[in-house]
Amino acid sequence: MEKRESSGGSGSGDAEVRKGPWTMEEDLILINYIANHGEGVWNSLAKSAGLKRTGKSCRLRWLNYLRPDVRRGNITPEEQLTIMELHAKWGNRWSKIAKHLPGRTDNEIKNFWRTKIQKYIIKSGETTTVGSQSSEFINHHATTSHVMNDTQETMDMYSPTTSYQHASNINQQLNYGNYVPESGSIMMPLSVDQSEQNYWSVDDLWPMNIYNGN
């Protein structure tokens, strides 16, 4: 359930801050605002865009979910190997590791490490080299015929859809409430670097798993 917090004092509605899952409407507002004005200072951006969210919440939502160059889909065996090698070298420096995996976020890599790789290494109980552990981990998952099919349990992702009816059904499943914009009535920029005339419609973007947190 959505929560609202007030910074107190003034009693103004502008002081209220929304907590909890982002709605489709908020996502569209944030994406279109950044497409037109750039990222800038996040606290100022949130207010200018008319979002009753903290600057931190807007930043995390954009960087981890809405940014056009965020890579979608399962982490590949090659990426798994890179994560293990760089973690052995740098430890839990997720932002630094993410720079070597284009399109992957530090949060996604951290979740993958903690829920997949680390769990497997602890379970194996072996003190082998990183290379050996990497090969064993990848081979173990490859032989199950679903190297990363189960990662969606721990990562919030979305994939495009061309079916508006399907998007509407998913909209209800993801607890967006009763907010279902008319097909094509809200347009989304394909990229912040491209012309303002290049847009995604809701049909092309949704469904999308919501980020439960700020």
Curated annotation (Swiss-Prot):
GO cellular component: nucleus
Entry protein name: Transcription factor MYB24
Domain of life: Eukaryota
GO biological processes: gibberellic acid mediated signaling pathway; jasmonic acid mediated signaling pathway; response to jasmonic acid; stamen development; stamen filament development
Entry keyword set: Activator, DNA-binding, Nucleus, Repeat, Transcription, Transcription regulation
Residues annotated to bind DNA: 42-66, 94-117
Gene: MYB24
Induction (free text): Up-regulated by jasmonate.
Role played: Transcription factor acting redundantly with MYB21 and MYB57 to control stamen filament elongation in the late developed flowers. Contributes with MYB21 to induction of MYB108 by jasmonate. Repressed at the transcript levels by DELLA proteins.
Compartments where found: Nucleus
Knocked-out gene: effects: No visible phenotype. Myb24 and myb57 double mutant has petals that grew to a final height parallel to the pistil. Myb21 and myb24 double mutant is partially sterile and has petals that just grew out of the sepals but ended at a lower level than the stigma. Myb21, myb24 and myb57 triple mutant has a strongly reduced fertility and an arrested growth of the petals that never grew out of the sepals. Myb24 and myb108 double mutant has a reduced fertility and a greatly reduced seed set.
Subunit structure: Interacts (via N-terminus) with TIFY10A/JAZ1, TIFY5A/JAZ8 AND TIFY3A/JAZ11.
Record carries keyword Nucleus: yes
GO molecular function: DNA-binding transcription factor activity; promoter-specific chromatin binding; sequence-specific DNA binding
Tissue-specific expression: Expressed specifically in flowers. Expressed in all four whorls of the flower and in the vascular tissue of stamen filament and sepals. Detected in male and female gametophytes, especially in microspores and ovules. Weakly expressed in petals and the upper part of pistils.
SMART domains, sorted: SANT
Domain HTH myb-type: 14-66, 67-121
SUPFAM superfamilies, alphabetized: Homeodomain-like
